Regions:
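Flexible, polar/low-complexity N-terminal or interdomain linker segments that lie immediately upstream
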Residues: 1-32, 60, 128-132, 137-141
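Short hydrophobic beta-strand that contains or immediately precedes a catalytic carboxylate
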Residues: 17-21, 34-37, 163, 208
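A conserved segment at the C-terminal end of the G1
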Residues: 103-108, 149-162
Length: 215
């Protein structure tokens, strides 16, 4: 079944999500909670792209099948591990051949799938649209180390809507930086994480954020 972005995300709590793009594309940015099972890895994707430019689509498709063939058992085994007997949510970049072929391959192994219409590109477009909506932001200001993050957590505990920008960025501002933090996400991934937080909010109500100034 082909699903819109909203339909796709609504099923995410019950169904595992698989991103079949290359590992390089996945590292640059991905949908929250997605597992990466590349149908073409970085080098293979380049090879298929080169074949497409030099010889056309038909030869590129043949090259793709030739590259995927020896790894098909491994792809299906990894997919079974991720699926755990559940139906899978699957996407590639544009909802094209990579996700379609992946769904066909694992379908022959008895794994049911749902494909994201428009792929990751549609998800990114949906995020951009969300960022254009009006927000009622209230900003907590103060010097670095003055306890802004603690105030934010207290507000969240009291039921206020909060976006923890430092938490999403894995960063504590200019003075403390990434000290004791996980690696910082790419700009694209930060945008994705911010979009995921916005999806949880009631945009008719106020939203508290923290000012990142050090003065």
């Amino acid at each position: 079944m082909v699903l819109s972005v909203d339909e796709f995300l609504q099923l995410r709590d019950q169904n595992p999500l698989v991103d079949v793009r290359s590992e390089g594309e996945f590292r640059e940015g991905h949908i929250r909670d997605a597992e990466n099972i590349p149908i073409l890895n970085n080098d293979e994707r380049i090879a298929v792209g080169t074949e497409y430019k030099q010889k056309g689509q038909k030869d590129a498709i043949k090259t793709g099948f030739k590259l995927v063939g020896p790894r098909l058992n491994d792809i299906i085994a990894e997919t079974e591990r991720v699926a755990r007997g559940k139906e899978l949510l699957v996407h590639c970049w544009r909802g094209g051949m990579r996700s379609s072929n992946f769904c066909q391959f694992v379908g022959m192994a008895g794994i049911k799938t749902h494909q994201l219409k428009g792929g990751y590109k549609a998800y990114r477009q949906r995020a951009t649209e969300a960022f254009q909506k009006p927000f009622q932001f209230l900003v907590i200001g103060g010097c670095t180390g003055s306890g802004k993050s603690e105030v934010l957590r207290t507000l969240a505990d009291k039921g206020e809507q909060v976006i923890d920008l430092e938490g999403l960025a894995h960063h504590k501002g200019s003075a403390f930086g990434a000290l004791l933090q996980p690696p910082q996400p790419t700009t694209e991934q930060f945008q994705n994480e911010l979009f995921e937080e916005i999806l949880k909010l009631d945009l008719t109500k106020r939203i508290w954020v923290e000012d990142e100034s050090i003065t």
